[in-house]
Amino acid sequence: MSTFYEDNMNIKKINGFTLQQVSRDVWAIDEFGIDIMYLIIGTERALLIDTGIGIGNIRSVVETMTHLPYDVVNTHHHYDHVGGNGCFSMVYAHKKAIPVIQEQNNLQSRKEFFRSQEARPEYNYEASLEFDASIIGDFEMKGIEEGFVFHLGNRDLEVLDTPGHTKDGICLLDRK
């Protein structure tokens, strides 16, 4: 179980990422002002929700925050949610998302994504210059659908199909 920081912001920095504790054992991970991911730490396992655009090494953040085994899940196929997948050996996603995620796992797609973001006021251009192409790599994908459950020990997160933003969108429901 992670420590709940009692300062007024519950914020810490790890390898350039800013983490804010949003509730006990739930952390929002800001990727250089570009994207937010979530880490939920259970008593037996942890779950990283999305991997960001992949500028920094999100794996090092997860492994600094917990020594528990963990799973990684993408909520949909958009690049700002799957760009760090190459940091991990296996990632879960809705079965409809897998072909798109695999197709965009290349340097050209990454560069096109960065260029498409440059006009956004929150885009951190300096961070994109730090991009490490070595994180574009092979990783196994496991398809999931509604009803799949991530068991973390003291909490279960159930997959709900939530198409809309994309046809392969999912949400995770913690019934506790």
Task: Label the predicted regions.
Residues R45-L48, I53-G54, A133-I135, M141-K142, ...:
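Metallo-beta-lactamase
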Residues D7-N8, N15-T18, L68, G137-F139, ...:
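Mature, folded catalytic cores of secreted/periplasmic enzymes
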Residues K13-T64, C171-K176:
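Conserved beta-strand hairpin/beta-sheet module of binuclear metal-dependent hydrolase folds
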Residues V22-A28, G147, D156-E158:
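Short, hydrophobic/aromatic-rich segments at coil-to-beta transitions
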Residues E6-K12, V26-E31, F131-I135, F139:
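Short, solvent-exposed secondary-structure boundary motifs
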Residues I55-L152:
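Active-site HxH/HxHxD metal-binding segment of metal-dependent hydrolases
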Residues M1-L19, E122-L129:
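Short, basic/low-complexity N-terminal boundary segments at the transition from targeting/disordered tails
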Residues S23, D30-F32, H76, K95, ...:
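Residues at the C-termini of beta-strands that transition into short coil/loop
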